[in-house]
A protein has these predicted regions:
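Extracellular structured ligand-interaction cores
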Residues: 85-89, 96-98, 106, 129, ...
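Aromatic- and carboxylate-enriched substrate-binding clefts and catalytic-loop regions
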Residues: 190-496, 531-532
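A residue-level signal for conserved active-site and pocket-lining positions in enzyme catalytic cores
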Residues: 90, 147, 184, 224, ...
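Catalytic core of carbohydrate-active enzymes
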Residues: 63, 78, 376-377, 382-398, ...
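Short acidic-glycine loop/turn motifs at beta-strand connectors
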Residues: 92-97, 260-262, 569-570, 579
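Glycine-rich, histidine-containing beta strand-loop boundary motifs that form or position
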Residues: 42-44, 55, 94, 102-105, ...
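Short, hydrophobic/amphipathic alpha-helical packing segments
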Residues: 65-71, 84-87, 178, 286, ...
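Catalytic and substrate-binding clefts that recognize carbohydrates or anionic sugar/phosphate headgroups
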Residues: 1-158, 168-170, 174, 181-186, ...
Length: 650
């Protein structure tokens, strides 16, 4: 059962799309206060677990830490980070009873989940203007499905988006991209997408293409399609301030950029230099910005990724002036300005919360200060594209995913989990984020495989790819200046061909399970706790996940390991895709097992009485041969497979 409670005058985020009547008073769970902002406090029993929060740090069970919903462009994802790129304010308290809460609040929201006091959870925010939805049910999964039912259907990607993609910040020219595709095809490593980071643009201007680097962009797009490759250009949130740039001039003329309190347009620096931010909370501006995607769609592009949309700010005029003044005092020998203060001021320039208080959105004629609705920017930037695609391409799906998000954006696109690093711990973080994201409606998700920042290693990349085989978004992405990490940069490319090839062998199953989850408000990834709630060991296992109703995955995520321990909550069939293209199968009883997994192998476990469809190796999604599909698993088991053309809107 879902109950809605109204506090103050909430901002309409449109995260919830189902009409729910308001209930009087407070939820009959914990204590609520509006005396000093808003707070909700409840005691946690020793065996209570807290699930949710979507894209957040640490484990699947969120107990024992402080999480802050405050979309932040901070690539240093160490354990102490309290905020990442997204704000997903849905939690479930799971113990002897099950209860879920969605706090529909677009500003900064704090979740102290046993951090200050181990047996107490407090959710708080500065302003007591929000909707609180309380959901009760028979199980954690029941609560998730009820929640998903009120926030609307998850985004459905085109089928080609379930192939493998190669990306790197640093591909600049048409020749760079052609070389990547050529090397993949020559080495027979599967590939469906190549991503275009900011260097394809003219001076980092949205909806432009550098004509020197791409003299015939439309022809290039068509050439790639002949190779069965979809190009995926990036779009950033900031619009360059430049006379003669049509997007800038139109936005100024129509009043579609965010303004300061005095009515002037707010300026901040991002990649293009000084920029304005489109006022995507203004419905007219949102439509205007979304329609600009047609500039590239009309040239044959059918996939995009939105970035820098927290929105990221390098510095503002005020921030720069403050830094210069501090540096000047230090140079002049001011004893009140030690050297470290200059460094702190420099670091504080980027994404400074004071800057988010300096600009406003025009929402139905009312000026709303950005920091009050900060977490909605990435959501509404992607919404602008999603709504535009329905007009531009009414019959055909377009791939879209974003870095920043709020619940509600899940209807318009997926997300990737941002600028991770080439750390073994980030493989595990990737794994643990997946079910939490699914709880909040984000199904088309994945991480930068191999790690975005720092230098990867061959073994780390192979192990991460073996997890990426199962994530809907499977993309290798790396930062400028890091070690090149395309598979052909390493010895024994046949190992990469095999691991990535397993993805294509499993597409008939993975795509089917994704579509079932999207169409039925279900989870593609589930924690073991949701499937085996009465099994104490399963409830506390966080490095294994269930996919659909048929399989469990348990990737290897430690360096130099030749395998790992796995807990089976029931009898299962251990299936290992071997480096030579064959499969190893063994039925294992319930219990703890050590399974060996070589670097060029991909393991999975099929539940008792189940089977899954597996195809032959293919180099692109369109090349997967329907007649090659056979069932793998328990003899006599059946599987209901979802199929469609992978293109038409549903």
């Amino acid at each position: 059962m879902v109950k809605k409670f109204v506090y103050g005058t909430p901002f309409e985020t449109e995260a919830v799309v189902k009409e729910i009547p308001s209930s009087e008073g407070n939820p009959d769970y914990g204590t609520f206060s509006t005396e000093n902002g808003f707070s909700f406090t409840t005691k946690l029993a020793d065996d209570d677990m807290v699930f949710g929060l979507g894209e957040a740090n640490r484990g699947i069970n969120k107990r024992g830490f402080l999480y802050i919903s405050d979309c932040a462009d901070d690539p240093n994802h160490v354990e102490s980070k309290t905020s990442l790129y997204a704000a997903h304010n849905f939690i479930i308290i799971s113990g002897k009873t099950h209860v879920g809460f969605f706090f529909d609040y677009p500003g900064t929201l704090r979740f102290d989940i046993g951090y200050t006091t181990s047996d107490t959870m407090t959710v708080s925010c500065e302003n007591a203007d929000l909707y609180v939805y309380m959901i009760t049910g028979d199980s954690d999964l029941d609560i998730v499905k009820q929640f998903r039912g009120i926030i609307g259907r998850s985004y459905i990607a085109p089928k080609f988006a379930f192939g493998y993609g190669q990306s790197r910040w640093g591909y600049k020219t048409e020749d760079d991209f052609r070389t990547v595709v050529k090397k993949y095809r020559e080495n027979h490593v599967p590939l469906d997408m190549v991503y275009m980071d900011i260097d394809y643009m003219q001076d980092y201007k949205d909806f432009t293409v550098n004509e020197e680097r791409f003299p015939d962009f439309e022809g290039f797009v068509q050439d790639m399609k002949k190779e069965k490759i979809h190009l995926v250009p990036i779009i950033d949130a900031g619009v360059k301030v430049e006379e003669g740039y049509d997007i800038y001039e139109e936005g100024c003329e129509k009043g579609y950029f965010c303004r300061r309190e005095d009515g002037s347009y707010f300026e901040a620096t991002v990649w293009p230099g000084w920029t304005h931010f489109p006022d995507v909370l203004n419905a007219d501006a949102r439509k205007w910005f979304g329609d600009k995607y047609d500039v590239l769609v009309s040239k044959g592009i059918d996939a995009f990724w939105n970035d820098m949309n927290e929105p990221s700010i390098f510095y503002s005029q005020e921030g720069l002036a403050d830094f210069k003044e501090t540096a000047k005092k230090y140079v002049e020998g001011d004893p009140e300005v030690p050297h470290y203060m200059v460094g702190e001021k420099l670091q504080a320039l980027a994404n400074n919360h004071e800057d988010y208080k300096r600009f406003y959105h025009n929402v139905n004629g009312e000026q709303v200060r950005h920091d009050k609705v900060h977490n909605l920017f990435g959501y509404n930037m992607t919404r602008s594209a999603g709504e535009a695609f329905e007009r531009i391409s009414p019959d055909k799906r377009i791939l879209m995913f974003s870095r920043s998000s709020y619940i509600g954006m899940h209807r318009y696109g997926g997300i990737w989990t941002g600028d991770n690093c080439s750390w073994w711990s980030h493989i595990l973080l990737n794994l643990k984020m997946m079910p939490s994201l699914n709880m909040c409606g984000f199904l088309y998700t994945g991480a930068d495989l191999g790690g975005f920042g720092t230098n990867t290693t061959r073994d780390l990349l192979l192990r991460w790819l073996a997890l990426g085989v199962f994530t809907p978004l499977m993309r290798n992405h790396a930062a400028l200046g890091t070690r090149e990490q395309e598979p052909y940069q390493f010895e024994h490319i046949e190992d990469f061909r095999n691991v990535i090839g397993v993805r294509y062998r499993l597409v008939p199953y993975l795509y089917s399970e994704y579509m079932k989850a999207a169409l039925n408000d279900d989870m593609y990834f589930k924690p073991l706790a949701f499937v085996y709630p009465d099994d104490k060991l399963a409830r506390n296992t966080e490095d294994q996940l269930m996919i659909g109703n048929e399989i469990m995955i348990a990737p290897v995520y430690t360096q130099n390991a030749i395998g790992r321990y796995v807990y089976l909550p029931e009898e299962m069939m251990f299936v290992k895709f071997l480096g030579n293209g064959n499969m190893f199968q063994e039925i294992l009883p319930k219990g703890i097992h050590y399974v060996e997994v070589a670097l060029n192998e991909v393991p999975l476990f099929i539940r008792k009485g189940c089977a899954i469809p597996v195809a032959d190796f293919a180099e692109s999604v369109p090349d997967i041969k329907e007649e090659s599909i056979r069932m793998v698993g328990y003899e006599g088991a059946s599987y209901e497979r979802y199929t469609d053309d992978g293109v038409s809107r549903i």
